């Protein structure tokens, strides 16, 4: 599979801004936007929470990987990945080989603040599905982030999304992506 720089994968922890920034970035670049989780929900006719509850995480991850594969031939598309998709070794390799990976990075406290009122994040609930305290949410995010961050850090481009206006983040990303694509184009001419 040949790497296609115009297929852009946004990765990062839940709450890092992928679903918010993704459509704006796609519009800025003149690309399409696809939210992988939303696509899975449409295909299954169920929310991610329902899929996790009924089929379990392993079944969800398998479906996530299969759905991801259907997107790999696209061009000029920004794809928002689920926060845990890159934990799957095959999905990680597919994404790295297929396109440009962009890591939207935020600190634990910011992620916890953004996610504290969300009820649709199955990995941020207690063992019996109960709502966690702010401290417990921060601890769980820190644990998951420690596991996922080595994969996130393999991204082609990293942008901090903390304490920035969304428009500024989109402008910075657009510049970095355009610069990255020019660099790739120049190196392929040599």
Curated annotation (Swiss-Prot):
Pfam families: SKI (PF01202). ATP binds at residues 15-20, 121. Its EC number is 2.7.1.71. SUPFAM superfamilies: P-loop containing nucleoside triphosphate hydrolases. PROSITE patterns: SHIKIMATE_KINASE. One of its GO terms (biological process) is amino acid biosynthetic process. Monomer. This is Shikimate kinase. The lineage of its organism: Bacteria, Pseudomonadati, Chlorobiota, Chlorobiia, Chlorobiales.
